[in-house]
């Protein structure tokens, strides 16, 4: 099997980003973005998705976190799309329910080639440690638009905003892991009746 790795650089007047991803990794992660809470959440993707991530970003944090968070989502989506390749032999679909104390989230993903985000997370607070939680929708929208996946994110229960967000990211990592797994019965076959994704 060919290596499912990618390295993408994205430079704008607002952010300079490098993302390296290995879909067949062990969950190793290295981040230098200037946004610690986002890094904590992306670590959940790596560990629960068993993908290796190395992400660096120099962004206009003197304004706010918006451009940095959104552009990391965009660049991660580009790297993911490149690493997953032609999708032959993968499971394509993935889903996970993840609890953390009182919080419970469900994430379902389809590596469909059609970008779509449906996200319903009724945060109980507007920020966690100074981080604007609305920016997570920007992160996932950026990822979806550039990875060309359909993603459903639902926080089903939760009172602690940190727990709500953490269950979303853990479930996303686990759903991603399921979707990119190779299916021996589908070896060399594209998982679509159209023959292409």
Swiss-Prot record:
Q: Where in the cell is it found?
A: Cytoplasm
Enzyme Commission number(s) from the entry? 4.2.1.19
Tell me one GO biological process term.
L-histidine biosynthetic process
CC annotations in GO: cytoplasm
> Which terms are listed as keywords in the entry?
Amino-acid biosynthesis, Cytoplasm, Histidine biosynthesis, Lyase
Q: In which pathway does it act?
A: Amino-acid biosynthesis; L-histidine biosynthesis; L-histidine from 5-phospho-alpha-D-ribose 1-diphosphate: step 6/9
Query: Under the GO molecular function aspect, what terms does this record hold?
Result: imidazoleglycerol-phosphate dehydratase activity
Per its record, the protein catalyses: D-erythro-1-(imidazol-4-yl)glycerol 3-phosphate = 3-(imidazol-4-yl)-2-oxopropyl phosphate + H2O
Q: Does the keyword Amino-acid biosynthesis apply?
A: yes
**First-tier enzyme category under EC:** lyase
Which Pfam families does the UniProt entry name for this protein?
IGPD
Question: HAMAP family from the xrefs?
Answer: HisB
Q: Which family does it belong to?
A: Belongs to the imidazoleglycerol-phosphate dehydratase family.
Name of this chain's protein? Imidazoleglycerol-phosphate dehydratase
What is the source species? Marinobacter nauticus (strain ATCC 700491 / DSM 11845 / VT8)
């Amino acid at each position: 099997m060919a290596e499912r790795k990618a390295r993408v650089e994205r430079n704008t007047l607002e952010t300079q980003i490098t993302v390296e991803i290995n879909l067949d990794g062990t969950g190793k992660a290295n981040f230098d973005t200037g946004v610690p809470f986002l890094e904590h959440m992306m670590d959940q993707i790596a560990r629960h998705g068993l993908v290796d991530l190395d992400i660096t970003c120099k962004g206009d944090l003197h304004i706010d976190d918006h451009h940095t968070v959104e552009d990391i989502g965009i660049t991660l989506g580009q790297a993911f799309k490149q690493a997953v390749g032609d999708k032959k032999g993968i499971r394509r679909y993935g889903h996970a329910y993840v609890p953390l104390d009182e919080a419970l989230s469900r994430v379902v993903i389809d590596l469909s080639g059609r970008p779509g985000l449906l996200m319903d997370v009724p945060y109980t607070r507007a920020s966690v440690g100074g981080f604007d939680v609305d920016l997570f929708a920007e992160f996932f929208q950026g990822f979806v638009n550039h990875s060309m996946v359909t993603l459903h994110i639902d926080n089903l229960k939760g009172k602690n905003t940190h727990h709500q967000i953490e269950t979303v990211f853990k479930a996303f990592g686990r759903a991603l892991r399921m979707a990119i797994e190779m299916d021996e019965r589908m070896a060399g076959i594209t998982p679509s009746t159209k023959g292409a994704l």
